[in-house]
């Protein structure tokens, strides 16, 4: 939790309380349903919460922004981002119902009114979004195929509407069909060794490819 406060010093008291509650909530749920790797649960704030918040170092979401989190799993990156940006709407989806039930319970416990969670495939989602976020659920070409018709036409941010993707390693081959993609090294923001090879990838997408 100290790392969150270090890198995001302007949190309100409510946000601090919400972030503090995450550990007990996920410890409790993980004992019932394995939504987070057993070896990672003790490093929840670094490997899941702070990792999710790396997106916020690239783009601060304006009020009224609509964000889709594809393959959210236990609620990452969506839940931490929803705490940080209470005036942004987040739609968290996954194909596994038990994970969505955990996300719904966590959002309810934190009283996150800006979160909707649903079991649904990305291809079947209705609506248009400013940004689509995810944590390495598949390779980028396949991911773009899932969500390419779900981007809003009007931009309200410095970054163009599109994908903000958390992934690591050498992405040269994976991104070769996306010349406007840009990689941001998370290690430039967070010093922990865990982030040494981790990146946020921004892929701008035109409306209705």
Curated annotation (Swiss-Prot):
Q: What is its EC number?
A: 2.1.1.-
Q: Where in the cell is it found?
A: Cytoplasm
Q: Which GO terms describe its cellular component?
A: cytosol
Pfam families on file? GidB
Keywords, A to Z, come to: Cytoplasm, Methyltransferase, rRNA processing, S-adenosyl-L-methionine, Transferase
- Residue ranges annotated as coiled coil are none
GO molecular function, one example?
A: rRNA (guanine-N7-)-methyltransferase activity
Q: Which residues bind S-adenosyl-L-methionine?
A: 71, 76, 122-123, 135
Task: Tell me the superkingdom of the source.
Answer: Bacteria
Q: What does this protein do?
A: Specifically methylates the N7 position of a guanine in 16S rRNA.
Give the family, as the similarity comment puts it. Answer: Belongs to the methyltransferase superfamily. RNA methyltransferase RsmG family.
Tell me the protein's name. Answer: Ribosomal RNA small subunit methyltransferase G
> Which species does the entry assign this protein to?
Flavobacterium psychrophilum (strain ATCC 49511 / DSM 21280 / CIP 103535 / JIP02/86)
